[in-house]
């Protein structure tokens, strides 16, 4: 009975804190401790060293002052017992303490207040989170590096591309080396071009730099500067779109010239259409007339008198060969072939009119010798027309052989007189 009494009185020796908690959970206090024998003192003796060891470990790992080990001891529960490092603290108390001390786990190793499972999760999650953040950071750095490399390559490509500048209002005596010398101080120049016409420089040109950055710097420095009293302007040259469109003729005969204008320039060709259908104005602009033997002959609406003695078959064949050619240069061979044969004068017309389609206007201009020296008889008119045809060189009259060329001022300011002044080497539009 004495031993039984000692066994019943043994549990209150666990400590003051454990006695209070044991009164709330009497069934838990009377449960046998695993690993203990039939003797009563062994459960209390087995619980005391483990609690003290856990308190010692907590004091070593914790830098802050903690409570006494007896106050931290928790009684055992009926659930399966936790592993030994937890020292009897149930898992239901571990979760709130883990939340309270989650931010201090990296600084303090409080193994007493938290279970190993939350710490394991935190330790396993934190490296993965750190690795994920590092991976994201590295990926972002790689992306930023790629973008910066792309931007730098684009900038280098844009700077390395050649650029063309338009320079206007430059002095008229400037030539390509002068322009190259003026712009060469800013960078390498690929090409320099000054635009000229038949009277000299037009006062503007183009400079092509190898590097667009050099071109921009030259444009900023030289734009608005005064060179030899002229304020030059430097701007970016705009690309001119060169369209190679085929010229569509609006006329039925295939010529690039209006029939009215063509009849003025070469009346013989259009008069020959009554004999050759190839150079007719077409059915739209001609009146069909039934000729002898049922042959339809197209008479043009522009009715011109036929010139006797004119070689119509030859002229018509030549004109048909050159149909569609531009009259700006190449088409003159048509009229040159027509004028090769000295035409006969038309008695019904005044003597000043002769069959030279291009240069008939010169006679109205200012040459009194032609106006009064032309006799009214047909024989003299024929000789004068032949002389006038031989006098022409096919493009412009050689005015240097004219006896009235040296007169100053000219007799009158007709077309031929003013043209002779320009062809004689004098031009009031010459820059210097």
Swiss-Prot record:
One of its GO terms (molecular function) is DNA-binding transcription factor binding. Residues 1-169 are annotated as: Disordered. CDD domains: RRM_FOX1_like. One of its GO terms (cellular component) is nucleus. The modification Asymmetric dimethylarginine is found at residues 339, 371, 423, 428. InterPro entries: Fox-1_C_dom, FOX1_RRM, Nucleotide-bd_a/b_plait_sf, RBD_domain_sf, RBFOX1-3, RBFOX1-like, RRM_dom. Residues 60-69, 101-121 have a biased composition (Polar residues). It is found in: Nucleus; Cytoplasm. The keyword Cytoplasm applies. Interacts with ER-alpha N-terminal activation domain. Interacts with RBPMS; the interaction allows cooperative assembly of stable cell-specific alternative splicing regulatory complexes. RNA-binding protein that regulates alternative splicing events by binding to 5'-UGCAUGU-3' elements. Prevents binding of U2AF2 to the 3'-splice site. Regulates alternative splicing of tissue-specific exons and of differentially spliced exons during erythropoiesis. Seems to act as a coregulatory factor of ER-alpha. Together with RNA binding proteins RBPMS and MBNL1/2, activates vascular smooth muscle cells alternative splicing events. This is RNA binding protein fox-1 homolog 2. The lineage of its organism: Eukaryota, Metazoa, Chordata, Craniata, Vertebrata. The gene is Rbfox2.
